Amino acid sequence: MGKMDEMILVAPRDDVFKKESLTFQGVYSEDSRVAEIMAQIEAAYREMRRGDAEEDPRFKQPIPYVVIKREDEVFLYERLAGGGESRLHNKLSLGFGGHMNAIEGAASFAEVLKLNTDRELEEELQINEEDKQAIVTLGLINDDENSVGKVHIGILSALQLKPGAQVEVKEKEQIAGKWMKVSELKQDDIYNRLETWSQFVVDILE
């Protein structure tokens, strides 16, 4: 089965944004509105073949997008040419995560989200459990101004690590990572190389 034949979770755009009454551009972090959109996704999500979903802007694919923080630093990575998503090669990114799959027996969308998020982090990174302090929801990301963004909605969270914690990338031929201070991420030479979602995140990071 090819990557595009994978069954992933989607939700109709009309439901997610209540026929555009909840639409936003960029990062949205107002709790009540975020909760409302998440409830809309929970009520309407279903499975779809990934190849079809990628070409159909009538549906939004919810994507966990986890930023790894350590004090005033964020873990930044570059997608190398050996990686999968050709539309994002040589871009810098702060977010880990990916398409969500249905979880049999999950009690809620929150549980489906947590299990998919845990799996993605486990696949991509080596982080000691005792170094993890908390995972905090920061909001939602939407970017309807490019073809990739049109079919996705990001569920943004931050994984806080203890001072001195180490992060190891597992897929070294696909991504190269390093720690960087938030102030450095805001400088043009780095900021302009970030994928759009990561630029949105930097804009709200202190």
Swiss-Prot record:
InterPro entries: NUDIX_hydrolase-like_dom_sf (IPR015797). Disruption phenotype: Essential, at least the last 3 genes of the locus cannot be deleted; could be due to polar effects on downstream ymaB. It comes from the Bacteria. Induction: Part of the probable nrdI(ymaA)-nrdE-nrdF-ymaB operon. Expression is constitutive but low, dramatically induced by thymidine starvation which requires recA. This is Protein YmaB. The lineage of its organism: Bacteria, Bacillati, Bacillota, Bacilli, Bacillales. The gene is ymaB.
